[in-house]
Amino acid sequence: MSATEYAIGRHCGVTFAGLKIASLVSLRKGEEDVIQTLSRRFAGKGFAFILLREDEERLLVYICHRARLTKYLFSPDVRAFLARFGYEYGSAEEALEQLKCRMKGEFPHEIGVFLGYPLGDVCGFLRDPDGCILCGAWKVYENVSEAARTFERFRRCSACICRHMDRGGRSRRYLMWFEKHSSPDTMSPLRAPRSLTSI
């Protein structure tokens, strides 16, 4: 199994499973063909693969479910929040292009919104990076119980995928399952196969 397959399975499975709006994964330079292949395969299922940043050695790839991201970005509170950072957009694609431009400078902490993090927690981090109540997939400042349950779902999904890959399986098996069962308008978590849930 290639390092790219493992990284995608480990870091992005929760997004393909519908548990998360989007994920980031760092890949070695030279894996552009893999990204393009997956992007074509999943475009009809509502997923987008976007190269946010690259340097001499690494690629930072953003993978999202377009419909879910669009719904979140166009919620009034999120749109007003992003406007504070200069975002003006008529589509999720336009917002992502602006994020990509901002990635050329200091790391933009509003990226949490693009990953589907609760707005209250994104704002909390900007106010007080060290004042979180709980730390998991993101730093939590409110609704701790709900966040803890979400983190546990993420953990179970990722752990099962990684266990399968560590035993010699291929992440492609899960990608093929996600591809088959995803739909462009999927707005809720998918029912994963037994091997993804029997932990």
Regions found by a protein language model. Name each.
Residues 20-22, 57-59, 108-110:
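Short, surface-exposed beta-edge/turn micro-motifs
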Residues 1-55:
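A structured, charge-rich N-terminal accessory region that forms the first stable segment of a protein
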Residues 192-199:
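Gram-positive cell-envelope targeting signals
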Residues 73-74, 99-106, 129-132:
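Short acidic alpha-helix initiation/capping motifs at coil-to-helix transition points
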Residues 137-187, 193:
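Long, compositionally biased
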Residues 35-91:
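A glycine-rich, hydrophobic loop/mini-helix early in the fold
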